[in-house]
């Protein structure tokens, strides 16, 4: 097994599967990206996995149909960037149909876990994200629980996925990376 495989975005418009069972040894989860141009709509059916779609930048309007019912109906989210703005996220279970529309264009990350059954679809606005900021000075960072592990924030939304973000905070953000002290 090779641990040196590099997975790159192909800058494909629409849904792009980046890491999956088909191209990696990942047997429990996958990763993808959605790119939509201004005015573009994307619609697809989710099969064999649950998805957490996390908006990185831009705007999106979401619809999710599940078991013959429209559960998420035109919910809207927007985000300027990952450092300054809290995310908007969408949970989509297996066997659901998702439709996304972007007025100004969007980029989102898609986190997947392979399963045949999921929970109800859920639109998670920024005000329902738990954020913390541990550390001091250049070691300060922000964590954001989007869909948490059991006992944490939003732990009842997904079946298998745990989704969150970690970003650096000012003044360390100017470097856009986190560092640790060198060891001898």
Task: Report each predicted region and the residues it spans.
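Tight coil/turn sites that cap or link beta-strands
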Residues: 38-41, 93-96, 105, 166, ...
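A short, N-terminal "cap"/entry segment at the start of jelly-roll beta-barrel domains
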Residues: 1-27, 113-174
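Glycine- and acidic-residue-biased ligand/ion/polar-headgroup-sensing regions
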Residues: 47-72, 165-184
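A generic structural signal for residues embedded in beta-strands
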Residues: 44, 62-63, 92, 100
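Ligand-binding loop in jelly-roll beta-barrel domains
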Residues: 76-118
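Conserved hydrophobic/aromatic beta-strand scaffold that supports enzyme active sites
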Residues: 31-35, 52, 89-91, 110, ...
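Short amphipathic beta-strand/extended segments with alternating polar/hydrophobic composition
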Residues: 45, 70-77, 123-124
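Hydrophobic, proline/glycine-rich low-complexity stretches
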Residues: 1-43, 50-63
């Amino acid at each position: 097994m090779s641990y040196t495989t590099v997975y790159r975005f192909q800058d494909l418009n629409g849904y792009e599967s980046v890491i999956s069972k088909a191209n990696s040894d990942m047997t429990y989860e996958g990763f993808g990206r959605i790119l939509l141009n201004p005015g573009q709509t994307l619609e697809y059916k989710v099969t064999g996995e649950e998805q957490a779609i996390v908006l990185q930048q831009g705007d999106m309007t979401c619809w999710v149909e599940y078991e013959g019912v429209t559960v998420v109906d035109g919910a809207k989210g927007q985000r300027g960037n990952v450092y300054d703005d809290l995310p908007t996220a969408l949970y989509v279970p297996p066997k659901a149909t998702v439709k996304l529309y972007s007025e100004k264009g969007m980029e989102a990350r898609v986190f997947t876990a392979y399963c045949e059954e999921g929970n109800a679809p859920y639109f998670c606005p920024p005000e329902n994200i738990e954020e913390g900021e541990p550390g001091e000075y250049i070691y300060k960072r922000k964590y954001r629980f989007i869909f948490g592990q059991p006992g944490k924030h939003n732990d009842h939304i997904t079946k298998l996925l745990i989704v969150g973000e970690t970003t650096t905070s000012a003044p360390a953000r100017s470097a856009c990376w986190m560092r640790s002290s060198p060891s001898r």
